[in-house]
Curated annotation (Swiss-Prot):
<feature type="region of interest" description="Disordered">
    <location>
        <begin position="635"/>
        <end position="720"/>
    </location>
</feature>
<feature type="compositionally biased region" description="Polar residues">
    <location>
        <begin position="527"/>
        <end position="540"/>
    </location>
</feature>
<feature type="compositionally biased region" description="Low complexity">
    <location>
        <begin position="41"/>
        <end position="105"/>
    </location>
</feature>
<feature type="compositionally biased region" description="Low complexity">
    <location>
        <begin position="304"/>
        <end position="475"/>
    </location>
</feature>
<feature type="compositionally biased region" description="Low complexity">
    <location>
        <begin position="163"/>
        <end position="241"/>
    </location>
</feature>
<feature type="compositionally biased region" description="Basic and acidic residues">
    <location>
        <begin position="854"/>
        <end position="863"/>
    </location>
</feature>
<feature type="region of interest" description="Disordered">
    <location>
        <begin position="26"/>
        <end position="120"/>
    </location>
</feature>
<feature type="compositionally biased region" description="Low complexity">
    <location>
        <begin position="696"/>
        <end position="707"/>
    </location>
</feature>
<feature type="compositionally biased region" description="Acidic residues">
    <location>
        <begin position="265"/>
        <end position="285"/>
    </location>
</feature>
<feature type="compositionally biased region" description="Polar residues">
    <location>
        <begin position="476"/>
        <end position="492"/>
    </location>
</feature>
<feature type="compositionally biased region" description="Low complexity">
    <location>
        <begin position="813"/>
        <end position="853"/>
    </location>
</feature>
<feature type="compositionally biased region" description="Polar residues">
    <location>
        <begin position="242"/>
        <end position="253"/>
    </location>
</feature>
<feature type="compositionally biased region" description="Low complexity">
    <location>
        <begin position="548"/>
        <end position="590"/>
    </location>
</feature>
<feature type="compositionally biased region" description="Low complexity">
    <location>
        <begin position="635"/>
        <end position="666"/>
    </location>
</feature>
<feature type="region of interest" description="Disordered">
    <location>
        <begin position="304"/>
        <end position="617"/>
    </location>
</feature>
<feature type="region of interest" description="Disordered">
    <location>
        <begin position="158"/>
        <end position="289"/>
    </location>
</feature>
<feature type="region of interest" description="Disordered">
    <location>
        <begin position="802"/>
        <end position="863"/>
    </location>
</feature>
Length: 932
């Protein structure tokens, strides 16, 4: 359906348009309302579903904007929030009256339509077909034009246009698109009425946050007076018992509101909108067809109400998010949060019930929202009560965002803005908790204070140290965990788990930026349409298995059932085995998703290959028998070589090369599992114990080799090549191998001594295996830092410094640190000691590097800066970032540009088709303007 696709697009722009009056949301909802008879309430529900996630992410984006914006902006938000929270209930009810009448497809009034931001496009093709049929039956040109809808549609300044990049506008916070939140934030103290009217397009919503009321406007399809379905956010006027047929009841009153009157004469108006059915037989006949279609779709019960309540939840979440970020900057938020908590309490009953229904609908977003919203609503109440300690809200943000769209983006945006904007969140939170820089630590502290928070606080309390350290590592070191509580989740969540093909605005930022000050170079997180699913990397697919793009979540919360639930389990129970996952997330391979290496990788990230792989590469001309021949066989050859030197030639023992078979009396046991080895001289069939080796000619086929294996097992004489100088060559090779082996032993001993001198005591105690020598760099770092944790903070900086300076090189003990951390996850106290010390030190160092030394890092688009594709490629080449991340991010960047241009062109063409012109939203013009 065009509607569904457009709803998805609008869902995208919801994030943008939460800041921008939710212009697209209003468009979608208005369109869907416009086509109520066509049974597209499901599309409304779909757009609401998208809007739910988008509202959360959009508000989180706004929070990030608030964090990025001046404190004055946040103060404005707080002022707005104070007014909004006091008026939320009334505003919701008022919003229910904002869309008083709905215009049906036949052109008759179904009530008043909201004056602005209402692009009545829904199912434009079907709609225009119906209108054309109806218009062809009318002689009066004005009536025909009215029915055709050419004077029904008017675009206000919704930030849509042929060349208008909503994402960039959202990033820049300077465009008219951002008038809604940013202008409100900037201008609400001066122009609450104007901005709110422009943003909300409702005289009723002067006091509301534009996000909240715009979301309400999107949901308010409601007309209690006109007996239409009440989609009121705050009201109880609708329910699962509302029959859809009620919409189409002919007895429904059709008041003609003066605000939407056309300029038709009274006579013409009475003819066109007469309630006399005798003059409307053509319309009624056409209407019945669509009513039949609509009734077939709806079966008399609206489950859409559930989705709509999710939007209410998201509005509450949006309130809390805005208040959280505002709390970070302002004390006024206590009142706001209390008011919001009251709203959350009002909506909790509705939203919880509806969220369960959404879970039944099989939408993973809603299921996640169930966890998030239920926990968050309860958490919101606690958090709102404790909003002075903003960290609870932040922890909720972590959980919520993680649950919501893999909005790791949101988590890391919130957490990263909290961590990066140590000025705002962390400093303020550090004012509350002077011990740690990280929000998650603060969250854990707050969680310790607030054990009543359902999932976030209790689970964070269960994992206090795990989440502290992991979130510290995830937030500041961005351990690209999709599943841990933070992980840049912002953009790192590169999994497209939903059907939509669109990724976030700057997926590039995702893993690299998630924690580090790199976020500051990205500008606000507004550029990330988090509602959009994220495509999985190949490693992720291998790690989790190829999952269907869309699936309904299982009924249980098995942490292994899906990434969602895995993620839920991290936040909900014991981090869903989140101890090891978070540790893996932080250290082993940068995320439960296997961003660095699969969990079963024998080498943890950064650990260098064992020496035999380096010194005895199979590509060397010398046959690499050390890997394949048993040690005692090597010792035997050494012993024989010594005898050769000591004894006279006549008494010299025969030397058996590895290619030859020693006398049958020398190898008691028969070989067990022969294997074939390729060498420059040919193939070798060797047994596990290395006692019996056979050389085949170089041109021997594999089939003949298999027969040789059988021959060896049957004690048949081995095939020995007749090489004249072969034994001499083998002797030289064995001498070389002996020398290499001795050198290796010496090097290992020296390096182990150095390591023992340099390794801190707590690491020596925790070592569970001998250190693997590193041949690429003999010096061990004085103050080891886990490259895995540094990687995301300053990948470009650390990847360069780790080679040149010993201070930032990876300690071989890092794998041992991983073990310690897993143990520490089980033992939270140990985690605090090791992880808080190490990770906080690392975080401080990383922060110092980011803030003070300002390492060279790729430039991401700032507030007023665009980054073209070539420049993006060049920046990535210079920053020595991971190639797979770059490729993924580049592909997503291209897809974003295509999607943005498609949306803009689509709307622009739609405007052209309807003979529309873009005008200033400040003009209070009638929607029905025949002069269009």
């Amino acid at each position: 359906m065009v509607n569904t696709l457009y709803n998805n697009n609008n869902g995208n722009n919801n994030i943008i348009n939460n800041n921008n009056n939710n212009g697209f949301n209003n468009i979608n909802n208005g369109q869907n309302l416009h086509r109520l008879e066509n049974g597209h309430n499901n599309n409304i529900a779909n757009s609401n579903n998208i809007n739910n996630n988008n509202n959360i992410s959009g508000n989180i984006v706004n929070n990030n904007n608030n964090n990025n914006n001046n404190n004055s902006n946040n103060n404005n938000n707080n002022n707005n929030n104070n007014n909004n929270n006091n008026n939320n209930n009334s505003n919701n009810s008022n919003n229910s009256n904002n869309i008083n009448n709905i215009i049906s497809s036949d052109g008759r009034r179904r009530g008043s339509i909201n004056k602005s931001n209402m692009l009545t496009h829904s199912n434009l093709s079907n709609n225009l077909k119906i209108r054309n049929k109806l218009a062809n039956q009318i002689d009066n040109e004005e009536k025909r034009q009215h029915i055709l809808g050419k004077n029904l549609i008017k675009l206000t300044n919704m930030g849509i246009g042929p060349n208008n990049n909503n994402h960039n506008n959202h990033q820049n916070n300077n465009n008219s698109n951002n008038n809604n939140n940013n202008n409100n934030n900037n201008n609400n103290n001066n122009n609450n009425n104007n901005n709110n009217n422009n943003n909300n397009n409702n005289n009723n919503n002067n006091n509301n946050n534009n996000n909240n009321n715009n979301n309400n406007n999107n949901l308010v399809i409601n007309n209690n007076k006109n007996n239409y379905i009440n989609y009121n956010n705050g009201g109880n006027n609708y329910g699962n018992n509302t029959p859809v047929n009620y919409i189409h009841n002919n007895s429904t009153p059709r008041p003609r509101h003066s605000s939407l009157r056309t300029n038709l004469s009274d006579e013409e108006d009475s003819v066109l909108y007469s309630s006399d059915d005798s003059e409307e037989s053509d319309y009624e006949e056409e209407e019945k067809k669509h009513l039949k279609y609509a009734n077939r779709n709806f079966s008399g019960v609206l489950n859409n109400n559930n989705n709509i309540n999710n939007n209410n939840m998201n509005n509450n979440i949006n309130y809390n998010f805005n208040n959280n970020n505002n709390n970070v900057n302002n004390v006024n938020i206590n009142n706001n949060n209390n008011n919001n908590s009251s709203n959350n309490n009002n909506n909790n009953s509705n939203n919880n019930n509806q969220l369960y229904n959404n879970h039944n609908n099989g939408n993973p977003n809603f299921y996640i929202n169930n966890n998030n919203n239920n926990s968050n609503n309860i958490g919101h109440n606690n958090n709102n009560n404790n909003n002075n300690v903003n960290n609870n809200n932040i922890s909720n943000n972590n959980n919520l965002n993680n649950f919501n769209n893999y909005n790791y983006n949101n988590n890391n945006n919130n957490n990263n803005n909290n961590n990066n904007n140590n000025n705002n969140n962390n400093n303020n939170n550090n004012n509350n908790n002077n011990n740690n820089n990280n929000n998650n630590n603060n969250n854990n502290n707050n969680n310790n204070n607030n054990n009543n928070n359902n999932n976030n606080n209790n689970n964070n309390n269960n994992n206090n140290n795990n989440n502290n350290n992991n979130n510290n590592n995830n937030n500041e070191n961005y351990v690209g965990s999709s599943l841990s509580n933070s992980a840049d989740n912002t953009e790192s969540s590169k999994w497209r788990i939903y059907p939509s093909t669109r990724a976030r605005q700057r997926s590039i930022a995702s893993e690299e930026d998630s924690l580090g000050s790199r976020r500051s170079s990205l500008g606000s997180a507004n550029d990330i349409p988090n509602s959009y699913p994220i495509s999985p990397t190949k490693q992720q697919l291998l790690h989790y298995g190829m999952q269907s793009p869309v699936y309904s979540p299982p009924n249980n919360l098995s942490p292994l059932s899906s990434p969602y639930l895995h993620h839920n389990s991290n936040n909900n129970s014991n981090n869903g085995g989140g101890n090891s996952n978070n540790n893996n997330t932080n250290f082993n391979y940068g995320g439960n998703i296997g961003l660095e290496r699969p969990k079963t990788s024998p080498l943890s990230y950064g650990e260098r290959d064992p020496p035999h792989v380096i010194n005895h590469d199979r590509r060397l001309k010398t046959p690499s028998f050390i890997d394949d021949i048993n040690e005692n066989n090597l010792q035997q050859s050494q012993h024989q070589h010594q005898q050769q030197q000591q004894q006279p030639q006549s008494q010299q023992q025969p030397f058996y090369s590895p290619y030859q078979s020693p006398p049958s009396s020398s190898h008691g046991n028969r070989p067990k599992t022969p294997k074939i080895i390729s060498t420059p001289e040919g193939y070798i069939i060797s047994s596990d114990d290395g006692s019996r080796l056979v050389v085949s000619p170089p041109n021997t086929s594999i089939s003949s080799l298999s027969s040789m294996v059988d021959d060896n097992h049957h004690n048949q004489p081995p095939l020995v090549p007749n090489f004249s100088s072969f034994q001499q060559q083998q002797q030289l090779r064995q001498l070389q191998q002996q020398q290499l082996h001795q050198q290796q032993l010496l090097q290992q001993q020296q390096q182990q001594q150095q390591q023992q001198q340099q390794v801190p005591t707590h690491q020596q105690q925790s070592q569970s295996r001998p250190q693997t020598p590193i041949y690429l760099s003999q010096q061990q770092p004085q103050n080891p830092i886990d490259l895995m944790s540094n990687r995301r903070l300053n990948s470009a900086q650390n990847m360069k410094l780790s080679v040149s300076s010993p201070q930032l090189g990876r300690d071989v003990n890092s794998s041992n640190n991983n073990k310690n951390i897993s143990n520490n996850n089980n033992n939270n106290n140990n985690n605090n000691n090791n992880n808080n010390n190490n990770n906080n030190n690392n975080n401080n160092k990383n922060n110092n590097i980011n803030n003070n030394s300002e390492p060279k890092k790729p430039k991401f688009p700032l507030e007023d800066e665009k980054l073209d594709r070539d420049q993006l490629i060049n920046e990535y080449k210079e920053s020595s970032l991971r190639l797979d991340l770059f490729v993924n991010s580049l592909d997503e960047y291209d897809q974003q540009q295509r999607d943005i241009s498609d949306i803009d062109n689509y709307i622009y063409n739609l405007c052209l088709c309807n003979n529309l012109e873009k005008h200033d939203s400040k003009e209070d013009e009638m929607l029905f303007d025949p002069n269009l």
